[in-house]
Amino acid sequence: MARLGLLALLCTLAALSASLLAAELKSKSCSEVRRLYVSKGFNKNDAPLYEINGDHLKICPQDYTCCSQEMEEKYSLQSKDDFKTVVSEQCNHLQAIFASRYKKFDEFFKELLENAEKSLNDMFVKTYGHLYMQNSELFKDLFVELKRYYVAGNVNLEEMLNDFWARLLERMFRLVNSQYHFTDEYLECVSKYTEQLKPFGDVPRKLKLQVTRAFVAARTFAQGLAVARDVVSKVSVVNPTAQCTHALLKMIYCSHCRGLVTVKPCYNYCSNIMRGCLANQGDLDFEWNNFIDAMLMVAERLEGPFNIESVMDPIDVKISDAIMNMQDNSVQVSQKVFQGCGPPKPLPAGRISRSISESAFSARFRPYHPEQRPTTAAGTSLDRLVTDVKEKLKQAKKFWSSLPSTVCNDERMAAGNENEDDCWNGKGKSRYLFAVTGNGLANQGNNPEVQVDTSKPDILILRQIMALRVMTSKMKNAYNGNDVDFFDISDESSGEGSGSGCEYQQCPSEFEYNATDHSGKSANEKADSAGGAHAEAKPYLLAALCILFLAVQGEWR
């Protein structure tokens, strides 16, 4: 009897210890949840010290929980912020790449034009002296128009260059025939013979082709970098739908409510949620990849025949060669013009000598050897810039289709693939068994985690798709050497974010309904139920065994 009484006492003590241990485990579990909750800046009074009944929860599992209703609501907002932050970080990195490369190209092209103008001015001052200074505005106007084309694009390069050569011919014709008086009407007649007489040789034709192709390619490429920068900037501002926010809450913080604060979401579970939340962004991928391919095509032109550096660097020598050609053939050119436009009126004798003295154009062209000729702009070369950008463009391909995976690869968002059995699947700590859905809006009809309205594409995304499509077309024109007109998307969609999907209908409340289980009693839920049962049973297992032992002892007697 004494022995039996001792056993009963021991079992009673064991049962009491087990109960205390269970309370202590609960306290520890919720205290850690509370600590992390407070660390995010939330009120500790929202968080219970012990597990409570979860009937008040609208999204997270309604078992015993460490989350109050206030916690679930604040976790919902926090999960949305976490998602926006991670997506923004990934997009901002890409946006910064395009922004910095656009800035480098822009600085390079502008400095290249400045260097070319300075080089021409220095060369012509030393070669032609006062004669050039008297006519320098003609060359200044040339560079003003070239700069205006690069900055604004509203210049017809062919017409502008034709006008430059016509004006230069008028000036040259006066200089080589300084003994005559020419009216404006006569000089207008002279300009009509430019194509027929070719007073400047083949330089105007070649230079017009080279300048047009090089400037079109350079400006289009720079504008392409700017468009890529702006598209990424606009799309990076995501506004999750209510359904997406529910899924994010369930993925990121509902595990905390179960006390599983160190367990991260399963990778495939995260992938399905991100593909649902970023469905519209996935639809950018096709036009984005076409745009990247077109940019790479133009980059090849910049490295080869349309290299603006190789065109602008020797432009002073080419124009001077044209002037020399006119000087060498001035007699033949003048005779043919006199035949076509009629003999000009000679100047009075006194004015003839003064005019010849002022022109002083009888001297031959003197070779110019500058002490230091600028060969690069902005401290680099076009080849180096293009090589760098080509590498970045190749890396940017398929950015939007890979964005969900990139987000889930962030250790803040999901566990690695190697932890498939030790991760949060939305209901418990177990393997995630659903297949990963495809990218894009059309593939989200069967997404097991996020309800997506596949009939309402995001307007902002559609605008960016159109911007990419138009820019791709202009890239192809530039690749073929054709001039292009540019459009302005800077004012479109300002301040908008993608993904809201609420433009056509009123957005539902954040906590309008409990998250729908699309699969009924899934394998995930069964695994979680089993896991939850194990967690609840452990504290009372010892007490149950003791009672069973006492009953058996009674039978033995």
Curated annotation (Swiss-Prot):
Lipidation (GPI-anchor amidated serine): 529
Phosphoserine: modified positions: 357
Signal peptide: 1-18
Keyword Manganese: no
Disruption phenotype: Knockout mice have short fore and hind paws, and display a significant decrease in the length of the snout.
Keywords: Cell membrane, Glycoprotein, GPI-anchor, Heparan sulfate, Lipoprotein, Membrane, Phosphoprotein, Proteoglycan, Secreted, Signal
Keyword Oxidoreductase attributed: no
Major location category of this protein: membrane
Family annotation (Pfam families): Glypican (PF01153)
Tissue/organ expression: Highly expressed in developing brain and kidney.
Subcellular location: Cell membrane
Entry's Gene Ontology BP terms: regulation of neurotransmitter receptor localization to postsynaptic specialization membrane; regulation of presynapse assembly; regulation of signal transduction; synaptic membrane adhesion; Wnt signaling pathway
GO CC terms, sorted: collagen-containing extracellular matrix; external side of plasma membrane; extracellular space; glutamatergic synapse; Golgi lumen; presynaptic membrane; synapse
Membrane protein topology class: Lipid-anchor; GPI-anchor
Glycan attachment positions: 494, 498, 500, 514
Propeptide boundaries: 530-557
Functional summary from the UniProt entry: Cell surface proteoglycan that bears heparan sulfate. May be involved in the development of kidney tubules and of the central nervous system.
Family in the record: Belongs to the glypican family.
The name this protein goes by in its record: Glypican-4
